[in-house]
Amino acid sequence: MTIGYTAKYTKTSSGYLGQLVEWPEVVTEGTTIEECRALLRDALTEMILAYRQQGREIPPGGDLLEQVLVEV
């Protein structure tokens, strides 16, 4: 089974903060966006394993974010 999650990346002074919208406990930091993506995927994999071991329900994915542009 494949589940899609929505990642949100925020630029910080030391790189990037990555967090899943549907599962906010899955969060990480990386010095580059590529590193942050890889670390977020690793964190998600570890969280899924932990939830399964604890018999907890894995949050559903599927949210969609869209950037809305406006001229100011």
Where are the regions a protein language model picked out?
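Short aromatic-glycine-(Arg/Gly/Cys) micro-motifs in beta-strand/loop hairpins
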Residues: 8-21
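Short, charged, surface-exposed hinge/linker loops at domain edges
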Residues: 1-5, 12, 38-72
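A short, exposed loop/beta-hairpin motif centered on an aromatic-Gly-Thr core
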Residues: 24-33
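Gly/Ser/Thr-rich beta-alpha loop segments that engage phosphate groups in nucleotides
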Residues: 17, 32, 57
